Structure formats: C-alpha cells, structure tokens
Amino acid sequence: MDQNLYRKCLVILSMMAMIGTSMATYAGTPWRTASATFYGDDTGSATMGGACGYGNMYDSGYGVATTALSTALFNEGYACGQCFQLKCVSSPNCYYGSPATVVTATNICPPNYGQASNNGGWCNPPRVHFDLTKPAFMKIANWKAGIIPVSYRRVACKKIGGIRFKFEGNGYWLLVYVMNVGGPGDIKTMAVKGSRTGWINMSHNWGASYQAFSSLYGQSLSFRLTSYTTRQTIYAYNAAPASWSAGKTYQSKANFN
C-alpha cells in the first residue's frame, strides 16, 4: 500500500475512534443500598458552596438537587459532578410508591469519629451515605424521619449545553473549576492548550478544579478532558477567547453523553 494512503487511513481510523469514544452514552450502574440524611433548611441556602468548589449552586446550574457524599463515595473529589438516583426503601417514612429523585454530588460529608457509624457518624468510612439538601430529601421521604435507608444508582447526568469552565488564578497559574459535565459527570484528567502552546497537562487541585502553572494570558484556550468513570476523552476547542480573565465563566460546545 502507498505510504501516504496508509498514513491517511490511520488518521481516519484514529478520528473514528475518537468520535466513537466521545459519543458513547454513559449507562449508569446497578441499584445498591445506602442511607441518607439531609442538612440545611427548606431553601437549601446552607448547602451553597461545598468541597467541589461549584460556589452558588443556582449560578452554577445545580440548584438544590444536590448531595454531599461520604468519603466512601467522594473519592478525593473525583466523584464531584456525578449524578445519583435515589429512592427511599423499607421505611414507614418513605413516600407512597417510593418515588425516585436525581441529585448531583457537590460536597463531602466528613466523618465524625466521635460517634458510632450507626448512631450519628453516618459518614464514617466505610459507610456509603448521602447527605442531601432538605428539598431533595423531601422528594423521597418525610423529613421528620431524619435518616432513611435508600437504594441508589449512578445515572447519566443530563445537562443543557456544553461544559463550563470558571477561571481563577493569575498570570502564571490557571485554576479551572469544571461544571455542567454531562454523562458520567466526572473528570479524571485535564489538559489545556493555548493558541500559542502545545497541550499542557493540568493537575487535580481539589474537588472539581484543575490547575496549570503556565503563562496563558492573551491566548484562546482549549481543553482536553477525560472522564474518571468511562475514561472517555473529549476536546473543548476554543472554550475561552484570548481576552479571558480570572473570575469569569466560559461555556464550551463540548460535553459527555
């Protein structure tokens, strides 16, 4: 075979593999058992912020359909953005028909080693536990229950539009909060490319934030993202213009399914 034709075939096959990987739809997980409580009040105002770094949940698009995860689920922040479907089971406080609700992981429920894991230390490892907002809890059970047994499973996150990137940092340090992630909802690795640079690997800072120690001001920025769960990779080209600045959020056209 002609060498030029051979190389062209390899390029086409690589592009087909990339498209197939990025377009695959996340199928979720089987049902498992856990427990759930809630924190905050009816407004969910006490649940703004959190360990994932999303800030105001309304501004970042998550609202009050959110949950804090015990360390068994939080996975050092790599679970940030994952979506879970929960329903109350085997409790007189469950609503009739055991309706389900979907929540996004936005915070960590820290261990309380001063209490037993079956008596107040609900988030002590290795216990699998969800600490929901009160509005989310009231979708599935009477809030007076305090704690309920639940069935849960991972589901695909259904998002409108592309992944959003909130920028912080300075001229030599770019910190990016990744939000509105569809499909598996999570990120394992990221890389950034300026219009005058090659790909620069970013390190996991905390929660849903990634950082690069490089001077990128005055360059349009693209991102390469790989899901923690599926290992699928997508590219968000020209996600931010050359005029980008810290404190602003930019929405790309790319997302996981």
Swiss-Prot record:
Family per similarity comment: Belongs to the expansin family. Expansin A subfamily.
Highest taxon in the source lineage: Eukaryota
Record CDD domains: DPBB_EXPA_N (cd22274)
Domain Expansin-like CBD: 172-252
GO terms, biological process: anatomical structure morphogenesis; plant-type cell wall loosening
Membrane topology of the entry: Peripheral membrane protein
Function: Causes loosening and extension of plant cell walls by disrupting non-covalent bonding between cellulose microfibrils and matrix glucans. No enzymatic activity has been found.
Stated name of the protein: Expansin-A18
